[in-house]
């Protein structure tokens, strides 16, 4: 079951998107996310401030 779920996830990525992610088309392979610019300390504070 787990293998099938992993395969379904891979099917949703197009070949051009995969090339971009892996850096095969001259890209860096980096996908910028909301956490890309954030400091680890900021995330640690968010997840530990109320515990």
UniProtKB/Swiss-Prot annotation:
- Point out the propeptide residues: 1-24
Q: How is it modified after translation?
A: Maturation of lantibiotics involves the enzymatic conversion of Thr, and Ser into dehydrated AA and the formation of thioether bonds with cysteine. This is followed by membrane translocation and cleavage of the modified precursor.
The residues joined by the cross-link Lanthionine (Ser-Cys) are 35-49, 42-50
Q: Which UniProt keywords apply?
A: Antibiotic, Antimicrobial, Bacteriocin, Lantibiotic, Thioether bond
Keyword Transmembrane recorded: no
**Crosslinked residue numbers (Beta-methyllanthionine (Thr-Cys)):** 33-38
Please, which domain of life does this record's source organism belong to?
Bacteria
**Annotated TM spans:** none
Cellular-component GO terms for this entry: extracellular region
Q: Name one Pfam family in it.
A: L_biotic_typeA
Q: Name one GO molecular function term.
A: signaling receptor binding
Residue list for modification (Z)-2,3-didehydrobutyrine: 48
Record's InterPro entries? Lantibiotic_typ-A_Lactobact
Any one GO BP annotation for this protein? killing of cells of another organism
State the family named in the UniProt similarity comment for this chain. Belongs to the type A lantibiotic family.
Q: What does this protein do?
A: Lanthionine-containing peptide antibiotic (lantibiotic) active on Gram-positive bacteria. The bactericidal activity of lantibiotics is based on depolarization of energized bacterial cytoplasmic membranes, initiated by the formation of aqueous transmembrane pores. Lacticin 481 is a broad spectrum bacteriocin exhibiting activity against a wide range of lactic acid bacteria and C.tyrobutyricum.
Query: How is the quaternary structure described?
Result: Monomer or homodimer.
Give the protein name, as stated in the record: Lantibiotic lacticin-481
Origin species, per record, is Lactococcus lactis subsp. lactis
The primary gene name is lctA
């Amino acid at each position: 079951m787990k293998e099938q779920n992993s395969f379904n996830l891979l099917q949703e990525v197009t070949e051009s998107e995969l090339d971009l992610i892996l850096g095969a088309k001259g890209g860096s392979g980096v996908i910028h996310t909301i956490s890309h610019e954030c400091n680890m300390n900021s995330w640690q504070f968010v997840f530990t401030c109320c515990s």
